[in-house]
Amino acid sequence: MLLAIDPGTTESAYVVIRDDYSIIDYGKMLNGNVIEMIKTKTTFYPMVIEMIASYGMPVGQEVFETCVWIGRFIQASRKETQLIYRKDVKLNICNSIKATDASIIKALKDRFGDKGTKANPGWFYGFSKDVWQAYALGVTYLDKERERL
């Protein structure tokens, strides 16, 4: 099992995933609550966080605030944390560095199934934008682990 986090300045999305890619838990919550979750979940699960990368362009305060939260999440973890860059997620899920959030979501639906409806929930029922990205991060980690074996 794995805890995957898409960090933000005040809230972060997370997904807990089994080794078969099935979803145990997901959501988006305030970063302080994410820290509390990390303290309990990483007793059992490894953790992966999307890491910020510099592409030579100016960045704003939000990027630096997110970096601080990434550090706090790592500090709260009881196991080794893997950092994965967004470009690696794009390449793994879509085979293109130019992939957008929409193309990542489409590729995940193609691979695992549709979102579904309340009456007929699918693999991703209840997912929202940032949760999709946390799941893509977790899938990338699990795919890379399988390649190593």
Regions found by a protein language model. Give the residues of each.
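Phosphate- and other anionic-substrate recognition elements at nucleic-acid/protein interfaces
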Residues: 1-149
